[in-house]
């Protein structure tokens, strides 16, 4: 058996899908968790200066979350039984990753750095804006959900094409800028300037000034994340219903990587907004089934609890 070493920070983050695959397959590995203060020591040793990285037999290094996850899924039997199944697993995983990636963007500064030091404060800031705006649910748009009555063969090809087109457009074109209300415009100045309405915001202090962040960018990242949820979640709910009415797994009778993605990609978004999956009962049921899997449940019991 190969020797596996997974490098990531001491958080769930982008590496959790890989850890869940190891757990589901009951395969041992070395889980190296790098403290944020030590990252500069490791940076030059990692391909692309990024994490996570999977190291195999102390020699081969594989970067990029989904490349690692797909490799492990193929090795461990969680990637479908033939090419169309694998394509289905791919577009479902990539759709969940769209949500997860836009969620992570909300906690990055303008230079692409994750703001670990301010993460708790930022979550409180977003939660306060949720309450003020009445944002509780991500409503389903029925026209975006694929029909469960369509044949599986047609569903596979059509939904794959639709998803590919969406992802291509997303990667090439930035979403159109949305004009803010006068109140929000007054909050989009640099963080060194306090908003003129309401009490002083605890987020607007020296930390934000040092990290060159501002409320306008936070609002834009939140808007992008919300739009991705409204686009992707109804599509995934409908895709799940295509097999066994959505009462088992995305591939039908057996669990694959995309079912694990349904759990880990939405774990933090659901901590921020417990209503996120309220309109999507099949996705909620799937997450329950994944968490009840004996190996996954054992992993959850033993894993290090982290806030992010």
From Swiss-Prot:
Residues covered by region (Disordered): 165-205
Keyword Methyltransferase annotated: no
GST C-terminal domain ranges (all copies): 185-308
A Pfam family annotated for this UniProt entry: GST_N
Compositional bias ranges of the Polar residues kind: 178-191
Record keywords: Eye lens protein
Domain GST N-terminal: 2-80
GO biological process: glutathione metabolic process
MF term (GO), any: glutathione transferase activity
Tissue: Lens.
Primary role: S-crystallins are structural components of squids and octopi eye lens. Contains relatively little if any GST activity.
Similarity remark: Belongs to the GST superfamily.
Protein name per UniProt: S-crystallin SL18
């Amino acid at each position: 058996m190969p020797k596996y070493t997974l490098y990531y920070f001491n958080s769930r983050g982008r590496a959790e899908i890989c850890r869940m695959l190891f757990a589901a397959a009951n395969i041992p590995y070395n889980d190296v968790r790098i403290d944020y203060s030590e990252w500069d020591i490791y940076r030059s040793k990692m391909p692309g200066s990024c994490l996570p990285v999977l190291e195999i037999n102390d020699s081969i290094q594989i970067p990029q979350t989904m490349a690692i996850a797909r490799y492990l899924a193929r090795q461990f039997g969680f990637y479908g039984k033939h090419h169309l199944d694998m394509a289905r697993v791919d577009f479902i995983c990539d759709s969940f990753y769209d949500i997860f990636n836009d969620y992570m963007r909300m906690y990055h500064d303008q230079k692409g750095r994750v703001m670990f030091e301010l993460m708790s404060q930022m979550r409180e800031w977003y939660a306060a804006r949720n309450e003020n705006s009445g944002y509780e649910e991500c409503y389903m748009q029925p026209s975006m959900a694929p029909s469960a009555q369509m044949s599986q063969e047609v569903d596979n090809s059509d939904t794959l094409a639709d998803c590919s087109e969406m992802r291509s457009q997303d990667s090439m074109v930035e979403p159109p800028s949305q004009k803010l209300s006068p109140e929000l415009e007054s909050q989009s100045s640099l963080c060194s300037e306090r908003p003129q309405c309401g009490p002083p915001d605890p987020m607007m202090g020296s930390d934000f000034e040092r990290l060159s962040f501002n409320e306008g960018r936070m609002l834009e990242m939140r808007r992008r994340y919300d739009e991705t949820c409204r686009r992707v979640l109804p599509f995934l709910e409908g895709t799940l219903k295509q097999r066994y009415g959505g009462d088992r797994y995305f591939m039908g009778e057996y669990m694959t990587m995309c079912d694990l993605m349904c759990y880990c990609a939405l774990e933090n978004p659901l901590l921020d907004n417990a209503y996120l999956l309220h309109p999507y009962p099949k996705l909620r049921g799937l997450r329950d089934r994944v968490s009840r899997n004996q190996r996954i449940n054992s992993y959850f019991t033993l894993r290090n609890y982290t806030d992010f």
